[in-house]
From Swiss-Prot:
PROSITE patterns: MFS (PS50850), PTR2_1 (PS01022), PTR2_2 (PS01023). Belongs to the major facilitator superfamily. Proton-dependent oligopeptide transporter (POT/PTR) (TC 2.A.17) family. DtpD subfamily. It is a multi-pass membrane protein. One of its GO terms (biological process) is protein transport. It is found in: Cell inner membrane. The keyword Cell inner membrane applies. The chain crosses the membrane at residues 14-34, 49-69, 91-111, 138-158, 167-187, 212-232, 236-256, 269-289, 312-332, 344-364, 379-399, 413-433, 458-478. InterPro entries: AA/pep_transptr_DtpD (IPR023777), Dipep/tripep_permease (IPR005279), MFS_dom (IPR020846), MFS_trans_sf (IPR036259), MFS_Transporters (IPR050171), POT_fam (IPR000109), PTR2_symporter_CS (IPR018456). Probable proton-dependent permease that transports dipeptides. Coiled coil: none annotated. Gene3D superfamilies: MFS general substrate transporter like domains. This is Dipeptide permease D. Keywords: Cell inner membrane, Cell membrane, Membrane, Peptide transport, Protein transport, Transmembrane, Transmembrane helix, Transport. It comes from Klebsiella pneumoniae (strain 342).
Amino acid sequence: MKTTSSQPRAIYYVVALQIWEYFSFYGMRALLILYLTNQLKYDDNHAYALFSAYCSLVYVTPILGGYLADKLLGNRMAVMLGALLMAIGHLVLGASETAPVFLYLSLAIIVCGYGLFKSNVSCLLGELYEPADPRRDGGFSLMYAAGNIGSIIAPIACGYVQEEYSWAMGFALAAIGMVAGLVIFLCGNRHFQHTAGVNRQALCARRFLLPNWGWLLVLLVTAPLLIAVLFWQEWSVYALIVATVIGLAVLARIYLRAETDKQRKDLRLIVVLTAFSLLFWAFAQQGGSSISLYIDRFVNRHIMSYEVPTAMFQSVNAFAVMLCGMVLAWLVKESVGGNRTVRIWGKFALGLGLMSAGFCILTLSARWSAAYGQSSMPLMVLGLAVMGFAELFIDPVAMSQITRIEIPGVTGVLTGIYMLLSGAIANYLAGVIADQTSQASFDAAGAVNYSIDAYIKVFSQITWGALACVGVVLVIWLYHSLKVRTRRLAVE
């Protein structure tokens, strides 16, 4: 390939696929908790448990998806197969109104598809560049920005279709989006000829009684069924425990094999950053569960005579990420000097502080609802926007530190462990937190009366919890700042 200032043509097909994958995933996610409570009439406890189990397992399966791509399928085939499975899953989800058994199966199919897609689309993009190609960073930035476009549009479009037509049509729109992305991607197939394809030799090699392609088919059939059983029996927590134990064991092994003090110091930093990221995302993931139900029940969503669908509020977060990303880029540019560790903790303190501020606004909103029956929509939008801005100071900072580690061959493993803890485990904890809002009573007619006091309590506790994290992070920041200052004075 020639290295020019323009991007490889293949990237635009990857970007299109990424837009539609985000559209599909976040469109469905915006509807799911509302579908479980409003349409299937699940109580809040059951809905939160299933929602958090689903959001947790989508961060576990990419580990297996990456392995299958490396050994058998190649990134391109894995991505296409994952997109197809997600589209099928969304269609099956629409049928769960008439046959509830399809609910667990559909979520399991989506989890499997996400595992094949998410772990490999970035690797496929990386294959488009030579290792030293200066266009690489720009390509990844383009894909990230494009994904946010999809996640902004999806809740608006799917929420509108669900409100005007049906839940099944809302989920079908998510499926159509995924199919559209896959068709566009296939149209550019000729631009991916230089990327790694299916490993035919490995597929045909026999292992035990079957060739590997036979075992792959068995896996594609049994994995969704097994995951569906995990959802049905509420056993997903056991899968998370096993994955976490394995992840921590691998992390300990990497630490013990580190050769220098600097490597061990960097690993300790990553571990502490991951712990704070886990707490941050346990708070932030309330957006798809407890916050969504709070908006549906206690926020005045009317603009003139039009009632804004609850699902549309999920777009606020993605829009804030895109808009405030430019501010973050300026902040990074203006603060390139100084000690890197000090900057890292400063950004984490800012991110957690913004999360606390966002939930403080939500607490005020909930108190307003308690006093006047309903809260105002602008106050809700402000709180969600502040929380979206907070995200920019957490994940990018932690991921940047992981990629800087000077231990050969562990970056991918550390990234997977980070996603497991800050993704899967954080989503499980988010479900535990959200469950504290599921306090309700019944009136004489049998109608459900939801407790606004429960939302006030949970939002307030998160506000103070995030603020406590800020205090701890500031102590760490101050320690490193004084350490750097002392070192400079000693040199002078």
